C-alpha cells in the first residue's frame, strides 16, 4: 500500500524508505538464465532486463500481464517567452485527442495490451514563468506529485509515464542544467521544432532561469523549474518504486523528471530502465548521467510515453525467452 502524502517531507521519506528488489528472485533468475538453451550472454540486453524485471516482481519466471501507461498534461508559463513553435492551446487539444484514442500513444498502448490513463493538471492555470520566479509553490508541487502518486494502479506490473505540455522541453532542459551543470546549450533541443533563432532564444531563457534559481536538491529544482506534468511523472515513478513496480522510462522529459528523484536518493531509479534514446538534444547525455542504457534508438522525439510504450514489446520478448525457453536438461541438449 502507498502511504498518503500530506507534505513534501512525506514524499522524501517514502522514497528513502522504499524497498529494494528481491535478492532471492534475482539469484533464481540468474540461475535459470544460465541453464537456458543458448550460449551465455547470447541474448544480450534481453537477458539483463529479464533478470532485472524478475527481481522486482519477485519471481524467477515473470510475465507482463497488466501494463499501465499514464499520460500527464500541463501548461507552462515560460511559453510566453516564445520558446515553442506551437501555442499553449495545443495541450488542451491533444488531451482531447488522447481521450478520443487518436494519438500515437493510444495505438502503442493498445498494441502492448496496456491500460491507458490521462490526467490533465490545471491546464487553465499554467505554471509561472520561471525566468521571473519559481514555476510552482510548494502546495502546487505537492498537488502535482500526489496526482502522479495516486495515478499508479498497485495491480499493474510495469509502468510507463508520458507527458503532453507545450514548453516542457524548455522546463526539462532547465532541470537538467540545474542538476548537472555544463552549458545550457548542452541540454537544449528543438522541442516542437523551433528554428535556429528559436533555439538560441530557448537556450538563453534556460540560462536566465537557472542563474535565477541556482542548483538545489531534486524537489526544489522540480518546484522552481518544472511543470505540473513533469512533477506528476516524478510522483508516479516514485510510487512505482515504493510498490516495486518496474518502470520503463520514456524520453528526455520523462528522464528529467526521473533525474529529480535520482538527486534525492541514489537508488531511486533502480526499478527503472530506459525505453529508448530520443532525438531531443540532451537525452543521450542525460541517460549517461542516470546510468541507463536505452532499449531502443529510433530517432523518436514525440513524447507522450511513445518510446517507452513501444519498449514494452521488447520487455515482453525478453520475458518470453527467459520464462518460456527450455533448459539444457529439459531439451536434452549438451551444454558443453
Swiss-Prot record:
InterPro entries cross-referenced by the UniProt entry: Nict_dMeBzImd_PRibTrfase (IPR003200), Nict_dMeBzImd_PRibTrfase_bact (IPR017846), Nict_dMeBzImd_PRibTrfase_N (IPR023195), Nict_dMeBzImd_PRibTrfase_sf (IPR036087)
Keyword flag Transferase: yes
Pathway: Nucleoside biosynthesis; alpha-ribazole biosynthesis; alpha-ribazole from 5,6-dimethylbenzimidazole: step 1/2
A biological process from GO: cobalamin biosynthetic process
Keyword Glycosyltransferase: yes
EC number: 2.4.2.21
Keywords, comma-separated and alphabetical: Cobalamin biosynthesis, Glycosyltransferase, Transferase
Example GO molecular function: nicotinate-nucleotide-dimethylbenzimidazole phosphoribosyltransferase activity
Domain of life: Bacteria
Annotated catalysed reactions: 5,6-dimethylbenzimidazole + nicotinate beta-D-ribonucleotide = alpha-ribazole 5'-phosphate + nicotinate + H(+)
Entry similarity comment: Belongs to the CobT family.
Designated name of the protein: Nicotinate-nucleotide--dimethylbenzimidazole phosphoribosyltransferase
Species the sequence originates in: Ruegeria sp. (strain TM1040) (Silicibacter sp.)
Lineage: Bacteria, Pseudomonadati, Pseudomonadota, Alphaproteobacteria, Rhodobacterales
Amino acid at each position: 500500500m502507498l502511504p498518503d502524502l500530506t507534505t513534501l517531507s512525506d514524499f522524501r521519506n517514502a522514497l528513502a524508505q522504499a524497498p529494494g528488489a528481491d535478492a532471492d528472485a534475482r539469484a533464481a533468475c540468474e540461475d535459470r538464465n544460465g541453464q537456458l538453451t543458448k550460449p551465455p550472454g547470447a541474448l544480450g540486453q534481453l537477458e539483463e532486463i529479464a533478470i532485472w524485471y524478475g527481481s522486482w516482481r519477485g519471481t524467477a519466471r515473470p510475465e507482463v500481464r497488466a501494463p499501465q501507461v499514464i499520460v500527464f498534461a500541463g501548461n507552462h508559463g515560460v511559453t510566453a517567452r516564445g520558446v515553442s513553435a506551437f501555442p499553449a492551446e495545443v495541450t488542451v487539444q491533444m488531451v482531447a485527442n488522447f481521450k478520443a484514442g487518436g494519438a500515437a500513444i493510444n495505438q502503442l498502448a493498445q498494441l502492448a495490451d496496456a491500460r491507458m490513463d490521462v490526467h490533465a493538471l490545471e491546464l487553465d492555470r499554467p505554471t509561472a514563468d520561471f525566468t521571473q520566479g519559481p514555476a510552482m509553490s510548494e502546495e502546487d508541487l505537492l498537488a502535482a506529485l500526489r496526482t502522479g502518486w495516486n495515478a499508479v494502479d498497485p495491480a499493474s506490473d510495469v509502468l510507463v509515464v508520458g507527458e503532453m505540455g507545450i514548453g516542457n522541453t524548455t522546463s526539462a532542459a532547465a532541470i537538467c542544467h540545474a542538476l548537472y551543470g555544463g552549458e545550457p546549450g548542452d541540454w537544449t533541443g528543438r522541442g516542437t521544432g523551433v528554428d535556429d533563432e528559436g533555439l538560441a532564444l530557448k537556450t538563453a531563457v534556460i540560462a536566465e532561469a537557472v542563474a535565477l534559481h541556482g542548483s538545489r536538491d531534486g524537489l526544489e529544482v522540480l518546484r522552481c523549474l518544472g511543470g505540473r506534468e513533469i512533477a506528476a511523472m516524478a510522483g508516479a515513478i516514485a510510487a512505482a518504486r515504493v510498490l516495486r513496480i518496474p518502470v520503463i522510462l520514456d524520453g528526455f522529459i520523462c528522464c528529467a523528471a526521473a533525474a529529480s528523484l535520482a538527486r534525492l536518493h541514489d537508488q531511486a531509479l533502480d526499478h527503472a530502465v530506459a525505453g529508448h534514446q530520443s532525438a531531443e538534444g540532451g537525452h543521450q547525455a542525460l541517460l549517461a548521467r542516470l546510468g541507463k542504457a536505452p532499449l531502443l534508438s529510433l530517432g523518436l522525439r514525440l513524447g507522450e510515453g511513445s518510446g517507452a510504450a513501444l519498449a514494452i514489446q521488447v520487455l515482453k520478448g525478453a520475458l518470453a525467452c527467459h520464462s518460456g525457453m527450455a533448459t539444457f536438461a529439459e531439451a536434452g541438449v549438451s551444454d558443453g
